[in-house]
Amino acid sequence: MNNKVHVLQGIVIRSKMQKSIVVSINRIVKHSMYKKFINRTTKIYVHDTNNISNVGDIVEITECRPISKTKCWKLTSIIKKYNSS
């Protein structure tokens, strides 16, 4: 049994759903043939029980049991709040 906990950091790009946010995860991948580094992004649906995060926040998320068809991550903490001013 694998007890390794997956923890990622990302930026909230959408928070208009109830108890759900969409987090963008950026990673750098090396191209296998051209050996050039490429930026890749992944959009992950995250469960936010208290609706505390807003667009632009940098958050930490943890993998959990499936909550719905698309959500299997939960919000652990907000690392940095986004200020719009």
UniProtKB/Swiss-Prot annotation:
User: Which keywords annotate this record?
Assistant: Ribonucleoprotein, Ribosomal protein, RNA-binding, rRNA-binding
Q: Which GO terms describe its molecular function?
A: rRNA binding; structural constituent of ribosome
Any Pfam family? Ribosomal_S17
What InterPro entries does the annotation carry?
NA-bd_OB-fold (IPR012340), Ribosomal_uS17 (IPR000266), Ribosomal_uS17_bact/chlr (IPR019984), Ribosomal_uS17_CS (IPR019979)
Does Transmembrane show up as a keyword for this record?
no
Q: Name one GO cellular component term.
A: cytosolic small ribosomal subunit
- Keyword RNA-binding on this protein? yes
Example GO BP: translation
Q: Which family does it belong to?
A: Belongs to the universal ribosomal protein uS17 family.
Function as written in the Swiss-Prot or TrEMBL entry? One of the primary rRNA binding proteins, it binds specifically to the 5'-end of 16S ribosomal RNA.
The UniProt subunit note reads as follows: Part of the 30S ribosomal subunit.
Question: What protein am I looking at?
Answer: Small ribosomal subunit protein uS17
**What organism does the record attribute this protein to?**
Blochmanniella floridana
